[in-house]
Amino acid sequence: MSKQGFKNVPMAPALTWPERLGQYWKLVRGDRPIGSLLLLWPTWWALWLAAGGLPPLWTLFVFTAGVWLTRSAGCVINDYADRWLDPHVERTKSRPLATGAVSGREALWVFVVLMLVAFALVLSLNWLTVALSVPGLFLAASYPYLKRHTHLPQVYLGMAFGWGIPMGFAAVQGSVPLLAWLLYAANILWATAYDTWYAMVDREDDLRMGSKSTAILFGRYDLIAQGVLYALMFAALVLVGLRAGLSIAYWAGLGIAALLVAYEFHIARHRERGPCFRAFLHNNWVGLAIFVGIAASLALR
């Protein structure tokens, strides 16, 4: 469905400054940190592996702050791209752009400011990291528009969410070795899987509005496809562990992560909206388990 088929986005109501700041906070998902955590864990995986343990503190700060800034910017540009669609979807109709509490122009300014602050932080790192930030910006800004043209926006999200991995290796080592790309591939598979849970929540609305997703592409084979994605993710992480020479702590972390993923399938086995969303949220613990495995393995060397 084209945006001409949608009703106009409401005019912004009169708000006090505290109310307006609250709407900006909602716009950047400050009230929902799950997205930042899903972006943070693979970034920390990369930094710890690149440094062989605790990375330089300034580098850790830049990437941790950058995770929040870029994820927030990604949420803003996503809502801007979907401002015609969100008022018609139950889960998104209360977003600030959908209600008109924040205008499209305001949202673009928020996006620009967030990305400029993130870029300013990156400028304190080496030239390779700065150069890699440019395709990272393109990935973050273009992702929201993919759902109109392909059933694979979740794959693209994985590419965008994982770009901190090659950047992290570049910042610590001054290069991006094969290990970084193996980890990046694992993250793409992971993000595609967990965002498919998320897409399963919106599948009926997306079908009605003409949006595309892996949940729609997989159809009744969605749980099988999810199993394949998670299996490939763990296969890639096995290669990461072997190449990095990680110890038993890492393999224990992977084992715990696998059990957590199995529980996600139990939760979402009936494909209901609420359980699918819980399965999506549950991936925070998967990322944490893998990080603890990496950090413990490196600390015990």
Swiss-Prot record:
The gene is ubiA. Keywords: Cell inner membrane, Cell membrane, Magnesium, Membrane, Transferase, Transmembrane, Transmembrane helix, Ubiquinone biosynthesis. GO terms for biological process: ubiquinone biosynthetic process. It comes from the Bacteria. The lineage of its organism: Bacteria, Pseudomonadati, Pseudomonadota, Gammaproteobacteria, Lysobacterales. One of its GO terms (molecular function) is 4-hydroxybenzoate polyprenyltransferase activity. This is 4-hydroxybenzoate octaprenyltransferase. Catalyzes the prenylation of para-hydroxybenzoate (PHB) with an all-trans polyprenyl group. Mediates the second step in the final reaction sequence of ubiquinone-8 (UQ-8) biosynthesis, which is the condensation of the polyisoprenoid side chain with PHB, generating the first membrane-bound Q intermediate 3-octaprenyl-4-hydroxybenzoate. It is an enzyme of class 2 (transferase). InterPro entries: HB_polyprenyltransferase-like, Prenyltransferase, UbiA_prenyltransferase, UbiA_prenylTrfase_CS, UbiA_sf.
